[in-house]
Amino acid sequence: MASQFCLPLAPRLSPLKPLKSHFTDFQVGICVAIQRSDKRIHLAVVTEINRENSWVTVEWVEKGVKKGKKIELETVLLLNPALASTEHQRSRRPLRPVSVIPATAIGDQRTATKWIAMIPHRNETPSGDSQTLVIPSNPCLMKRKKSPCLREIEKLQKQREKRRRLQLEIRARRALDINTGNPNFETMRMIEEYRRHLDSSKMSRLEPPEDHRICVCVRKRPLNERETTMKDLDIITIPSHNVVMVHESKQKVDLTRYLENQTFCFDHAFDDTASNELVYQFTARPLVESIFRKGMATCFAYGQTGSGKTHTMGGAFSGKAQECSKGIYALVAQDVFLLLRTPAYEKLELKVYGTFFEIYGGKVYDLLNWKKKLQVLEDGNQQIQVVGLQEQEVGCVEEVLNLVELGNSCRTSGQTSVNAHSSRSHAVFQLILKCGGKLHGKFSLVDLAGNERGADTAKATRKRQLEGAEINKSLLALKECIRALGKNKSHTPFRASKLTQVLRDSFIGQNSYTCMIATISPGMTSCENTLNTLRYANRVKELALEARPYPPTDHEMPLTLENGNTNSEKSLQKDDIIQIPTVQKEEEKESDELTSTKEPAASWSRSGPWWEAIQETAEGVNCDVDFCIAQSLSILEQKIGVLTEIQKKLQLLRDDLQKKSQAE
């Protein structure tokens, strides 16, 4: 490069020879080459010489402005070696101008060639914008002296680069140690390769959700200490604000490992860095104001035991103590009391009451009254009443937190194979607004017990197995009620469990709003439970995944990455029936067979609701399987004749059209 050429080597100065002796070669008005701070080299006129301090002052004109600077004598001699000795000055030969900067680089002379020139004295001031310099006929390379500051900077830079190299070596060594000791190293490599091809979106780009009667969100927790010790893998990826991907490791017959990537779409998805405040902002917060408009709001956390439900609803744990001020309980209470003081609702003179009870083994217990057993009855107005439930009036957030702490201390918990401190009951905390002693609105915050698979509780005690069966039964009933709420069905199966009976007023009516927070564990050992949770949440509100092509990976076996289906299989709907193609009107007039074909097709389309009725019955909690099968077979036998007749008519119509086309 041009910038690598420097000046002719100056005669080496003897340490005994003072620098002042070289001032004999300097005169005010001569032109010398100087170097700017941006590495440009151009000519300047010497205007002052300080022999005591060994520096000179130079001036030049740049862009119509006269500039100047002080330069040490040693620096000037390095750039002007011809001044170092009178012998060199006397034997100076004529110099020729050479362009050192291309014409296209006017104004930027950082790559200017570092040549020195001695030009006879002129009356004009040299310009810093000049593109040409007069150079000696025999230029040679020289070593430019660096300032102490620059030398220190370079020293620090070398030390920094050395430290970085050492850190990279240490990280590579640690990664190698981890990988060799991790039995799932191949799966981890496939997951990392797949994630590198995904486009992540920032959580800060989230917008408040639309006004839905039901909102389904998913929250992923980080790997806990137990999973990290076991060298478990994080198999959950959240590429955008509403998509969750599960990388399930599978094995082929030839023992080749591959990934089956299952994708789910929800209203919102939160990764392991999301705080409780962020989760609350997009889940329960939009529902708070609805209870001031005589609405019934419900927010519940669902997921595997140990996936973070109680952490989300109640707050973070510090040992066995829970910080309730950071949970959704406290955040809802803060917004309720803030809205209560606004002018729009202050005139209603509303009072706030709090209740806290649990549902364990199909029975209801009051957590604010020493776990007193309660009865759930239906009055003459078909309203569910929890007889004996204690309601305590609260006037601030601190009083609400006291109720939460009191209830959590009495809540039933136990030890499972997954979680040493697992909640074994459904806890329901309610904030009730009353106006003149009458119910105005209610917000139910439900911390559900963890769902469990039978395989996980096979070695558990009989008590734990009965607990798990009762929990799963109530969760199934809750799912059906929420689906009926989301689809505006006329029938809601809330009598299937005590949990749905207690929350009946949250499912019935047009002012009912529900938010579900599905918490999932990221570990590979929890893959089956995570998929069950996501399928449950997906069935609650089936959202179509937006068609977005994710970039495939270029790896072949054994790094095969297969994209699995995203959502759980949808049931057959009446719109899925095969439709008969429409024939042009001219052919309809010419063919009598087509008219007869319309009649069975019409009867088939009119019989669409029968399948929907059977489907709704089969999806119920207490459905009779034998009755559904018998009813379906009976109806299908009746429809077989209709389908056979349609088939014959279509064949005749096709033959007729072929004959006409041949005749033409």
From Swiss-Prot:
Domain Kinesin motor: 213-543
The keyword Signal is annotated on this UniProt entry: no
Post-translational events: Phosphorylation at Thr-125 by PLK1 is required for activity in the correction of kinetochore-microtubules attachment errors, while phosphorylation at Ser-204 also by PLK1 is required for the kinetochore localization and activity in prometaphase.
Compartment(s): Cytoplasm, Cytoskeleton, Microtubule organizing center, Centrosome; Cytoplasm, Cytoskeleton, Spindle; Chromosome, Centromere, Kinetochore
Modified residues (Phosphothreonine): 125
GO molecular function terms listed in the Swiss-Prot or TrEMBL record: ATP binding; ATP hydrolysis activity; microtubule binding; microtubule motor activity
Cell cycle in keyword set: yes
Function: Plus end-directed microtubule-dependent motor required for spindle assembly and chromosome movement. Has microtubule depolymerization activity. Plays a role in chromosome congression.
Protein name as annotated: Kinesin-like protein KIF2B
Organism: Rattus norvegicus (Rat)
